[in-house]
Amino acid sequence: MINFETLIKLENAFSNILFYEKDHKYTIDGIPARMSVSQLIKKFEKPFNSKAIAEVVAKRDGFSVEEILEQWDFKRDYSCHKGSEFHKYVENFFNRKQISLDKTAINFFFEDKKTFKTKNSIKEYYQDVALLIKNFKNFYDWWKKEHIIIKSEFVIGDSETGVCGTIDNLSYNFVKNEFVIFDYKTNKEIKRKGFKGDKMIDCLSHLDQCEFTKYSLQLSLYSTIMEKITNFSVPSSYIIWVNGEKDYELIKCLDLKKESKMILDNCKY
């Protein structure tokens, strides 16, 4: 059963880890961290040859390679902006704060991307974010029946390896009496298999290179770091995919703690 002593221990365990949002950088005891969890996972991914693939797509669709690369950059940046605004909304929601979407930020975004702006761009953006929020609220209605929030946007790290990350939602299941990690994903889809059978590399070559694997590994690394530093068990983690047309999808992560411990051990100074 969770108590104040548990909460204090959890708070103190990572008090030396800071996250600088503007630069997306972490420090440990005032010293720059070696890498984020996402950067660590990236080391085990096959490089994406964007130019070679863009050449194929450009030829197929009748665009120049540069136009295809620009389209991809726009889609990536748009998705990141939308995801950031959604995460900001959710963090405030758990603090019982209702906020409006940042109109200045989205207008500034499209000012910098005028090539891709249409008369409906802003309207479509609000519709996209409204869908994410609707699905999140459906998730919340399910979640609150058995969970309480412990930390939202919880910054964690491991001094021994220099690896840090941010947990979207660290919850406590008061029915099962255990911690649970939830992570919100706003991307278009979550692929369960590697493209044409693609696998990750090196010691993770037995794993499919796809979103489901990478997100499972991400949350397994969060769990592994938490268990290592606090000794609190985190038996399960879930991806909350909120970009479905009809509703959210609750996706139980693969158990990749063995792999997580292995790659963390290889990061030790």
Where are these regions (language model features)?
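Gram-negative outer-membrane beta-barrel domains
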Residues: S159-E160, I201-S205
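Accessory terminal regions of nucleic-acid processing enzymes
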Residues: M1, N95, F154, E160, ...
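Nuclease catalytic cores
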Residues: M1-E160, C164
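Substrate-binding/catalytic groove segments of enzymes
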Residues: I99-S100, E178, R192, K228-P235
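Conserved catalytic cores of phosphodiester-cleaving nucleases, focusing on short active-site segments
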Residues: H87, G165-N173, N177-I201, Y222
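A generic structural motif
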Residues: G157, Y172, I240-V242
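Short, solvent-exposed loop/turn segments at secondary-structure junctions
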Residues: G157, T186-E189, G244-E245
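Metal-dependent nuclease catalytic regions and adjoining charged, substrate-binding loops involved
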Residues: Y126, D208-Y269
